[in-house]
Amino acid sequence: MIKLGIVMDPIANINIKKDSSFAMLLEAQRRGYELHYMEMGDLYLINGEARAHTRTLNVKQNYEEWFSFVGEQDLPLADLDVILMRKDPPFDTEFIYATYILERAEEKGTLIVNKPQSLRDCNEKLFTAWFSDLTPETLVTRNKAQLKAFWEKHSDIILKPLDGMGGASIFRVKEGDPNLGVIAETLTEHGTRYCMAQNYLPAIKDGDKRVLVVDGEPVPYCLARIPQGGETRGNLAAGGRGEPRPLTESDWKIARQIGPTLKEKGLIFVGLDIIGDRLTEINVTSPTCIREIEAEFPVSITGMLMDAIEARLQQ
């Protein structure tokens, strides 16, 4: 029997209709895996050994009562075959410390999804720089004068922090906007933090597409998140409307170009954000949208993921 651990935010607080981690747990349980539930505070390191207080978990598709704990134990993480790191951002120093603990288990043979080193290496905004032929025009800087020059060149730009999620602190600055200075100061904290600027993509009106990639293979359907009511951001967390769709030719091209790098880096479950035919983000920490896509199309993304995990465990 495969022992699967999951590190996640409190399961009591999730919305099971939309929660991708919950979908993964349902599929793992369907396959007869033993489920071990952990929150960040359950992980610890003693004399170099990664351990955790885990609770054995049962899950069910029931909106009143979707989980129950059926046991608890303290064990070496290396006793688990696979651990899903599904803690939501912020990607802060605490998150990084957790990846070091998980890495100690990985060295003993536990498969960590996604690979701890790659979680540290691949910032969701900055990792796109390795695929700059696929992205919008992009500037990463602390320098207000450079941001101003970029804005003057493109006259309509998006500014965002490198560590936000769910559309937090994303600004659109159009031609003639008097607020560029204060936005630049806010995002860079007066020149002490990097931020990202990209030219505005009018295709956002048709949606910001979340394309999922499982062990290098694109899922054939995506979720387009469409901004509502004059909003620039499509993120569901910012009120966007989700619309599942088949991938377009350009979606396939982007996903296939990036897929081999993701696989090689042990990034087994990744969400690409694509606007029009441009790649804007590579989400590696805790990508979502599984349930919305599976509800609309005949595809089991969690099945693809567990197949990929089982294939890696047999290697």
From Swiss-Prot:
Organism whose genome encodes this protein: Escherichia coli O157:H7
Required cofactor names: Mg(2+); Mn(2+)
Family annotation (InterPro entries): ATP-grasp (IPR011761), ATP_grasp_subdomain_1 (IPR013815), Glut_synth_pro (IPR006284), GSHS_ATP-bd (IPR004218), GSHS_N (IPR004215), PreATP-grasp_dom_sf (IPR016185)
Keywords for the protein's UniProt record, in alphabetical order: ATP-binding, Glutathione biosynthesis, Ligase, Magnesium, Manganese, Metal-binding, Nucleotide-binding
Cofactor notes: Binds 1 Mg(2+) or Mn(2+) ion per subunit.
Catalytic function, reaction form: gamma-L-glutamyl-L-cysteine + glycine + ATP = glutathione + ADP + phosphate + H(+)
Key word Membrane present: no
Protein EC: 6.3.2.3
MF terms (GO), sorted A to Z: ATP binding; glutathione synthase activity; metal ion binding
Binding of Mg(2+), residues: E281, N283
A cellular component term, taken from the record's GO annotations: cytoplasm
Residues covered by the ATP-grasp domain: 125-310
Cleaved signal peptide residues: none
Annotated pathway: Sulfur metabolism; glutathione biosynthesis; glutathione from L-cysteine and L-glutamate: step 2/2
Annotated family: Belongs to the prokaryotic GSH synthase family.
Regions that span the bilayer: none
Protein name: Glutathione synthetase
Xref: PANTHER family: GLUTATHIONE SYNTHETASE, RIBOSOMAL PROTEIN S6 MODIFICATION PROTEIN
Domain of life from the UniProt record: Bacteria
Pfam families xrefs: GSH-S_ATP, GSH-S_N
